[in-house]
Amino acid sequence: MIDTSIPYYPLIMSKTDTDIYPKHSLPNGYEFVFYKEGDARKWAEIQTAVCSFGSVERGIEVFIRDFIENQPLSAEERVLFVRDEKGEYIATAALWDGDHFGSREQRIHWVAVHDAHGGKGIAKAMMTCLMELYRSLGYNGFIYLTTGTRNYPAVAIYERFGFKLYEETKSLFTDLDDEAFTKQNETAIKLVNTMLKR
């Protein structure tokens, strides 16, 4: 669940020991399915339900931009959904690529679980599935993700998978110089640590 009561700052987390991660399975009644043509609305509905977008239509636009238009990767192989026993699509995540670190690197992207299905280990099962997909595609040694302060419960999950918060002083955002990035990142990490009571 996104906590909109606190300020939003972006965070980056990365992992180098990509062969080591916990193994979680979906609870009974849920199954993994991959994207197929026409599923953009399902993705957008999930993301809108968790407040990623103000409207489903905006979510569809972002899906097409991020996963369909001018993309060398296949959404059918990399965009994951979770479906419940009624056939409803209730969660999604993707293994994609990104260039925050200056070169094309694999990333966990757009993780979301509908609030009605939260607390059941679905996000953890998706993380295990995506790490296994990462390895099956022949990648090794580095993977990252972006998240934000309002998603601090997710930060704790990612840490259990060995992801670490980026704390270096080199900016990974094009709109911030190193000094501004460092100040913002320190504020963000302090806020997350406060919310996680550590």
Where would I find each of the regions flagged by the language model?
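Conserved acetyl-CoA-binding loop of GNAT-fold acetyltransferases
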Residues: 4, 158-168
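Hydrophobic adenine-recognition pocket in adenosine-nucleotide-binding enzymes
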Residues: 35, 111-113, 147
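Conserved acetyl-CoA-binding loop-helix of GNAT-fold acetyltransferases
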Residues: 110-113, 119-136, 156-160
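Conserved beta-strand-loop-alpha-helix junction that forms the acyl-donor binding cleft
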Residues: 144-155, 171-182
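Conserved GNAT acetyl-CoA-binding A-motif
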Residues: 134-147
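Acyl-donor-binding surface of acyltransferase catalytic domains
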Residues: 1-28
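A short beta-loop-alpha structural element at the N-terminal edge
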Residues: 31-43
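A conserved beta-strand-loop-helix scaffold within acyl/acetyltransferase catalytic domains
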Residues: 47-112
